[in-house]
Amino acid sequence: MLGGCSSDQSLLADTRQQVVEHVAAPFSQSAITLNITAEPGLNSWNDIASSCTVLVIQAQKASSLNRIMSNPAQLKSLYHGTGAEDNILKVDRYTMMPGKRTTLHIDRSEHTRNVAIVAGYYPFPKKQHMALITIPVTLDSSGWWSKSWSAKLSPIIIDLTLGSHSISHLSHYSTQAPDQTHAAQPVTDGKLTQGEE
């Protein structure tokens, strides 16, 4: 009996994972909300604050975004509005001024599963100026004895604070499950890891 329960649990976990992996990723209007706060000393060079352009890059695969973030020539072309790879679904640019706050409502493109944030600090964005975020998935189950699962991509809210020399805060959460907040911490390989607060 216990063995049967254990294999049922394993099957349920596998089914849930398959549903998440194969979730549909349709276009969704204003499904990405980006709250940006720029500190007064934004993008300081020789103690002089200046503007900073933020890229919001959408792609289906995280690997596509990691390739872009580790390729200075491609990043530069994205800042100039040219040269996006076929795997890049959408690029939005917004220039922040020191001491300002703004909220952007960005459409999520069809097939988007991952979003990269790149802040254009002087002289060029480095690892501490980038973040990779996976679009959250909301799971629903129905049935008592035999559960069936359905999944959909959730709208996401990203809170971003731009400090003097790097991103000083980045967190995100789904509007479907507001109690699930994730913070991003810089690591040495160019990605920001996500962990629950």
Regions found by a protein language model. Give the residues of each.
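Residue-level recognition of well-ordered beta-strand positions that form the cores
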Residues: 35-37, 55-57, 118-120
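Short coil-to-beta strand junction motifs in C2/discoidin
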Residues: 46-55
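Bacterial Sec signal peptide processing site at the extreme N-terminus
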Residues: 2-24
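Mid-length scaffold segments of soluble, non-membrane domains
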Residues: 59-129
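Short structural boundary motif marking the start of a folded domain
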Residues: 28-32
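Short histidine-centered beta-strand/loop micro-motifs
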Residues: 43-47, 105-107
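Glycine-rich, aromatic-bearing surface loops/beta-hairpins
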Residues: 130-197
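Short amphipathic, basic-aromatic surface patches that mediate peripheral association
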Residues: 34-45
